[in-house]
Amino acid sequence: MFKLNRKKTELTDNYHRHSEAMIISCFFNPQNSVYRLKAFKLFYESIKHLNHTIIECVIGNSIPQLEENENIKRIYTENLLWHKESLLNKIISNLPAKYKYIFWLDTDVIFTNPDWIVEGVRQLQSNNIIQPFEYCIFLEKDEIKPSFSMDDIKKSFLPNAINNKVWRSFSANFVDTELWKNRSYHKHGHVGFAWGAKRDILDSVPLFDKALVGGGDHIIAHAAAGQIPHSCISNDFSAIIDIVNQWSSDFYGVVNGKIGFVNGEIYHLWHGDIEKRQYVKRHEYTPMTKDIVLRDENGLFITNEIDDVNIKRYFEEKEALEGKRKCFFRVRK
């Protein structure tokens, strides 16, 4: 089990605080990837001095990996599905009212701008939702910063065409280019890693939680921009497109296209090759999740059946594992 390291590092206390801002995240690692755990440790070192709430979701017979404290809690569920948005909604619903600005972050990212959260709150005075970064960079194994300069890359609005490890954020493109209207994921901007919104937006319309093999951020981005329907989403979520479009319309109704971003970069810490993420192929499994409607006592979707072998394989292959793979998907007795 990962225990919190109290020793200061170069990442500790680097980000500046805002009293009304709350960071929320979830962690699940049923494949027992040592690299995902390593990424979490680096991430946590960078945000542990800020207001934060994290849920570790222990799936099936997986072994808990995080030490619980007042900010890190643990819940259990049976089925291997993408529970991210359900977990985030659960956190938001239980937050004290004093937190007016919510930032939901993946637990494998590092920000270069120490004022990202303060500037994020500033952006949310005139916008309803933001991405708190302009560029995202996929790091190589064991890196904590890129091995290349961003100077020339930033001169292009299509950084991914210059270096396939770099994207501009969807929100940055929304603010100052027309690229957000493009149908190509590589051109319209990256939709993942980190978002922030006014608390009342998420209270009014909770995050879409039926993207059970992932992709919820993609739905959020196009919905916030009022792109309903959008070919990206119609193609990837055709099996559940009616509920996606209904949620998207509701979400746009409160966001109303008021989207912003924060200057700076975000580093994605390596825990598996990007080529193995199968961001497109994974949506082949969405039809398998269409009829999943049951939820457990924590509000997470369950099937009351053995996990689908194809979905299990997808989650296994997207992670970097050391040694012989073990089965972490037995149903708890």
Where on the chain are the PLM-derived regions?
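Hydrophobic targeting segments
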Residues: 19-25, 47-54
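Active-site-proximal specificity loops/subdomain of glycosyltransferases
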Residues: 58-99
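Short, charged/polar "capping" segments at the starts of alpha-helices
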Residues: 32-34, 60-66, 140
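Conserved catalytic core of nucleotide-sugar-dependent glycosyltransferases
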Residues: 112-215, 221-226
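Short, acidic, metal-binding catalytic loop of nucleotide-sugar glycosyltransferases
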Residues: 36-52
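C-terminal catalytic/acceptor-binding lobe
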Residues: 1-18, 29-36, 43, 211-333
